[in-house]
């Protein structure tokens, strides 16, 4: 049973968010949470909260055991960009883009050992 959670319009550029997200893809939930707690990047606490939310959804809505969950898919999409202005010399302005991200995680149960595949 797949469980999905998503956070939208996070004020982190997608490129920087993907650096953190790539570290936890495919890991068991317990390991992914442990890794995110020690990463210094701005995206780490956001992803940590998202994983905890997905685990709570799995436990509450589908009666799944959080100890048997793993990160099946996690990806970052680009959100809207906001234009902001940066003052320059001689009364001119430069354009700055404030980038945002949408982060989606899909958790699934670990397959049982010895269970037939297919």
From Swiss-Prot:
Protein family: Belongs to the universal ribosomal protein uL22 family.
Any single biological process term in GO: translation
One Pfam family matching this protein: Ribosomal_L22
Organism listed in the record: Thermomicrobium roseum (strain ATCC 27502 / DSM 5159 / P-2)
Protein name in the entry: Large ribosomal subunit protein uL22
Cystine pairs: none
Gene Ontology molecular function: rRNA binding; structural constituent of ribosome
Assembly and oligomerization: Part of the 50S ribosomal subunit.
CC annotations in GO: cytosolic large ribosomal subunit
Coiled coil segments of this chain: none
InterPro entries, per database record: Ribosomal_uL22 (IPR001063), Ribosomal_uL22_bac/chlpt-type (IPR005727), Ribosomal_uL22_bac/org-type (IPR047867), Ribosomal_uL22_CS (IPR018260), Ribosomal_uL22_sf (IPR036394)
Keywords (A to Z) from UniProt: Ribonucleoprotein, Ribosomal protein, RNA-binding, rRNA-binding
Entry function: This protein binds specifically to 23S rRNA; its binding is stimulated by other ribosomal proteins, e.g. L4, L17, and L20. It is important during the early stages of 50S assembly. It makes multiple contacts with different domains of the 23S rRNA in the assembled 50S subunit and ribosome. The globular domain of the protein is located near the polypeptide exit tunnel on the outside of the subunit, while an extended beta-hairpin is found that lines the wall of the exit tunnel in the center of the 70S ribosome.
Keyword presence, Ribonucleoprotein: yes
């Amino acid at each position: 049973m797949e469980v999905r959670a998503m956070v939208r319009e996070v004020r982190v550029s997608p490129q920087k968010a993907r650096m953190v997200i790539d570290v936890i893809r495919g890991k068991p939930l317990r390991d992914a949470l442990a890794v995110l707690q020690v990463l210094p990047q701005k995206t780490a606490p956001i992803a940590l909260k998202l994983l905890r939310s997905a685990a709570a959804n799995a436990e509450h809505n589908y009666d799944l055991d959080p100890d048997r969950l793993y990160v099946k898919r996690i990806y970052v999409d680009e959100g809207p960009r906001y234009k902001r202005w940066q003052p320059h010399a001689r009364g001119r302005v430069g354009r700055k883009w404030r980038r945002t991200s949408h982060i989606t995680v899909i958790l699934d149960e670990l397959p049982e050992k010895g269970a037939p595949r297919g």
